[in-house]
Amino acid sequence: MTVLIGPDPAPRLDKALAREVPEAESLSRSRLSRLIAEGAVALNGKVTTDPRAKLVEGDSVEITVQDAVDVETTPEDIALDILFEDDDLVVVNKPVGMVVHPAPGTPSGTLVNALLHHFGGNLSGIGGEKRPGIVHRIDKDTSGILVVAKSDRAHHGLAAQFEAHSAERHYLAICHGVPNAADPRLRGVKGTSFEEGGILKVTTQLARHKTDRQRQAVLFQGGRHAVTRVRVLESFAETISMVECRLETGRTHQIRVHMSHVGHGLVGDQVYGGRRKVSEKVFGATAQIIAGFPRQALHAASLGFEHPVSGEFMRFEADLPEDMVELLEALRGNGL
């Protein structure tokens, strides 16, 4: 969508768009602010994440908004690994390769299609027809735990916890190198520090990449605040590690971007540089498994939150998927 700025524009970009974007586009002021922060707005052909950018008459503002799904979302008989269910919510363990909700090019086979089959109309409607019950998401090729709202009151309560960053989200990942205090490559990397227990803290801002709209990029001003804490659980000859990543915030691709930023991209991550040459210390079939790992080695292993109705704190865990287990077994069997 392109907006041409007319006479006497508002003094800053966010206010100007709130005034100039047609109501028919259904873009609220808060949604426009998020689009700016995410790098989805270009001023005169150049991406800007500054909501205070000055405008003059004749400026051209391009807004990139994902197209709506134009097909009906239908129930599909897809098996679900249900960890918990009550009248207000359901907790599922999403498999690798499953998209959370329909999107352009993926109208079926999603978690939403499966949820509609299993729960029908017993899902929160706050997310709209295309995202019933969906409170948060994980990437298609990331496995692990999601909580889905069955009632609107649960949706409001859960969404508030994710917004306040009080939900506890822990991921397990397999990355290149060993991201600990002994790694000289981490010295001087902007946005990094070490906490008690050798935990690496990564603090940056994230926004959509200026040239590749499918990626996120690290910024230090103008994006959305993002914090990840990384703890090494197991390492293999200083060349591969299993790590726990704890999200303080939950931005798109956050763990993958942060691990790439600190020079420890996830094994198999084709977008953020995890497909790199395997160390000579890894040999034989193990080297082939690492080099050919088909997706980012990332699993949403633990989710904790306060039940939005009962107030009880609940925590759920999901075992590593088979492909990551096999990768770890190969590394351990390689004598590293």
Language-model segments: which ranges?
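RNA pseudouridine synthases
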Residues: 1-336
